[in-house]
A protein has these predicted regions:
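Short hydrophobic beta-strand element within catalytic cores of glycosyltransferases
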Residues: 344-347
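Conserved donor-binding/catalytic core segment of Leloir-type glycosyltransferases
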Residues: 4, 232-251, 257-260
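A short, well-ordered alpha-helix in the C-terminal region of glycosyltransferases
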Residues: 373, 380, 387-402, 408-414, ...
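Membrane-proximal helix-turn-helix segments that form the acceptor-binding/catalytic region
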Residues: 32, 154-193, 202, 206
């Protein structure tokens, strides 16, 4: 079976350059790739977009097809920033992908995410395409601004520099709106969808009622399997809460700040709230702290920046509870990784999170933007340690089954084979 992946993440591909710094999302794609490349009778090719000129190359039993896109000049960035994002290129990367299809001759194409710019291939090839549902843009667009915020929140900066920074979020909102409209039209061309939550099933069947849905769970990063079930309630004076965020408006930093303030002023519980993924200098930190008049440091919030898998695993094992405060999400692997370690988890009842957490059994659910309820649940976890530990144990049992590598690989291969059987002579492009 010849499998072509279209991914914004280059997977296991290694360059001669030093390891890249920055956001560490997408590691699960590399983990899934590790499973595929060690199977028999399967050939994997991976296509990704790069700003560095590169050629087709074979590594790790994978054929890599880089698509080169020249870096944008400052002028091009300015044009896109102030309205150019509205001009969606419906044929972007299409010619290159069709050439790759001709060269590799895949039996099936696996497209990672409807938000993937390579989704232009949908409806343009006779090779069956299965879409791996990730962050769905239309629901994200709907939940973009937290309660109490809108575009006008970003229009009155104190300096020219902040005007540029804050309008970066307005640009992000405008961009996600335009891309979500494109996503809606592309969903009409989806024949096969792959997901793992009740939420992504519902959204896909609403926007692509003609599509066939396959349930395939996701592989997590290696250190979390190596430390599965090893969490024990830390014996320390201060309680540690941990969250993993990106510098995105709807990830819930505002909820954390409001909850931390409540926890400090309405209880005598000593705590520290660790936030991985963003640094103290991040513009989103300055924005929310100023708008809410809450300084993170004064309410025991500590920003530790981006952590690799080993660092994050260590931080989680040293914490008492994991909190996921996002306003929208499908199946956040940060929750899954915490559960696999055995850590008690509190997540917002949004998107697909309720498919990961059964309230009162494998974790706790709280409404989005509910700092009072979240503060109460945190106090329960701190004062009723046996209850919190039991939540962690049940979450671990669920996560071990959900993220079983053997089962995931079996489900994925079966999905590929099922789709291929439904299609004949898939190698010609339209």
């Amino acid at each position: 079976m010849r499998i072509l992946w279209l991914s914004v993440n280059k997977g296991l591909y290694k360059t001669n350059k030093q390891e890249e710094k920055g956001y560490h999302g997408g590691g699960w794609i590399s983990s899934l790739q590790q499973l595929i490349i060690h199977t028999h009778d399967n050939t994997l090719a991976l296509t990704y977009v790069t700003h560095t000129p590169m050629r087709k190359e074979v590594q790790d039993n994978t054929i890599y097809y880089p698509i080169y896109e020249a870096p944008k000049s400052s002028w091009q960035k300015a044009i896109e920033y102030y309205g150019g994002y509205k001009k969606i290129d419906c044929k972007k990367y299409l010619h290159q992908i069709q050439q790759i299809i001709q060269d590799f001759q895949p039996d099936i194409i696996h497209l990672f995410g409807m938000e993937n710019p390579m989704a232009t291939i949908l409806g343009k090839t006779t090779v069956p395409v299965v879409v791996h549902l990730q962050g769905l843009l239309s629901p994200c667009n709907n939940a973009f601004f937290p309660v109490g915020f809108n575009k006008s929140s970003f229009l009155f900066p104190l300096s020219i520099r902040e005007w540029l920074l804050r309008n970066g979020y307005i640009f992000a909102k405008n961009s996600i709106h335009v891309r979500s409209e494109r996503e809606l039209s592309l969903f009409k061309k989806v024949k096969y969808a792959m997901g793992r939550t009740e939420w992504d099933y519902q959204v896909s069947q609403l926007l692509a009622p003609q599509s066939q849905y396959f349930h395939v769970d996701e592989v997590l990063r290696k250190p979390f399997y190596e430390n599965a079930g090893k969490w024990e309630c830390p014996d320390m004076q201060d309680y540690k809460i941990i969250s993993t965020l990106s510098n995105t408006i709807y990830k819930g930093l505002d909820t954390i700040l409001k909850t931390a303030k409540l926890l400090k002023t309405q209880s005598n519980i000593p705590f520290k709230w660790i936030i991985a993924g963003i640094s103290p200098q991040d513009p989103i930190v300055r924005f929310f702290e100023r708008k809410l008049h809450i300084t993170g440091k004064l309410v025991n919030v500590e920003y530790i920046g981006v952590q690799d898998a080993n660092q994050l695993c260590s931080k989680l094992l040293q914490s008492h509870v994991y909190v996921h405060p996002s306003y929208i999400d499908n199946s956040p692997n940060s929750i899954c990784e915490a559960q696999l370690l055995g850590l008690p988890v509190i997540g917002t009842f949004v998107g697909g999170v309720s498919s990961l957490i059964k309230h009162g059994d494998t974790g706790l659910l709280v409404p989005a933007n509910a700092p009072f309820e979240l503060t109460y649940l945190l106090k329960i976890c701190f004062t009723e340690k046996d209850y919190a530990t039991q939540l962690g144990k049940q979450g671990y049992k669920e996560a071990v089954q959900r993220h079983d590598k053997t089962k995931i690989l079996k489900d994925l291969i079966h999905t590929y084979q099922d789709i291929i059987k439904q299609n004949k002579n898939p190698h010609d492009t339209l």
